[in-house]
Amino acid sequence: MSRKLRYGLSAAVLALIAAGASAPEILDQFLDEKEGNHTTAYRDGAGIWTICRGATRVDGKPVIPGMKLSKEKCDRVNAIERDKALAWVEKNIKVPLTEPQKAGIASFCPYNIGPGKCFPSTFYRRINAGDRKGACEAIRWWIKDGGRDCRIRSNNCYGQVSRRDQESALACWGIDR
């Protein structure tokens, strides 16, 4: 079984990569699978009010309890958030990247942990120094949620471990060939 399949990338994500899809297409599919698309506000694992694919703000205003959006509005919000994440990658990652690599880094850094945690990270230092394998290893270290070790299944955050494996697989896509 290939390394990519072991890391649990879905058949849909693998098909997009095989077809030569763009980073926005790959990232959309990946985030739909990881975040879902909720048209009613909910609290995320950290207790923050979110909507759509994890947006915390809509039209410049914070998400509030009871907020509801149409699927079409969520699609627009999701596109804005996706494009911001990919623009962050283009601006801040100084090594050439493939489309799957852009999607993996966009999901991990700006989209999930946030730039404030990414900039001082070992991942960020390693990727920009050209140590791609080391950077991908460092993604997999981010497996705590609110201080809980997500490798312990009873902490109810094991999805974080799987997501980091998958983001690492995308961010390193093709470097082992």
Curated annotation (Swiss-Prot):
The active site is at 35 (proton donor/acceptor), 44 (proton donor/acceptor). Its EC number is 3.2.1.17. Its main location: host cell. It is found in: Host cell inner membrane. It comes from the Viruses. GO terms for biological process: cell wall macromolecule catabolic process; defense response to bacterium; killing of cells of another organism; peptidoglycan catabolic process. One of its GO terms (molecular function) is lysozyme activity. Keywords: Antimicrobial, Bacteriolytic enzyme, Cytolysis, Glycosidase, Host cell inner membrane, Host cell lysis by virus, Host cell membrane, Host membrane, Hydrolase, Membrane, Signal-anchor, Transmembrane, Transmembrane helix, Viral release from host cell. SUPFAM superfamilies: Lysozyme-like (SSF53955). Gene3D superfamilies: 1.10.530.40. It catalyses: Hydrolysis of (1->4)-beta-linkages between N-acetylmuramic acid and N-acetyl-D-glucosamine residues in a peptidoglycan and between N-acetyl-D-glucosamine residues in chitodextrins. The keyword Membrane applies. The chain crosses the membrane at residues 1-23. GO terms for cellular component: host cell plasma membrane; membrane. It is a single-pass type II membrane protein. Pfam families: Phage_lysozyme. The keyword Membrane applies. Signal-arrest-release (SAR) endolysin with lysozyme activity that degrades host peptidoglycans and participates with the pinholin and spanin proteins in the sequential events which lead to programmed host cell lysis releasing the mature viral particles. Once the pinholin has permeabilized the host cell membrane, the SAR-endolysin is released into the periplasm where it breaks down the peptidoglycan layer. The signal-anchor, which may also be an uncleaved signal sequence tethers the SAR-endolysin to the membrane until the latter is depolarized by the holin, resulting in the escape of SAR-endolysin from the membrane. Belongs to the glycosyl hydrolase 24 family. This is SAR-endolysin. The gene is R.
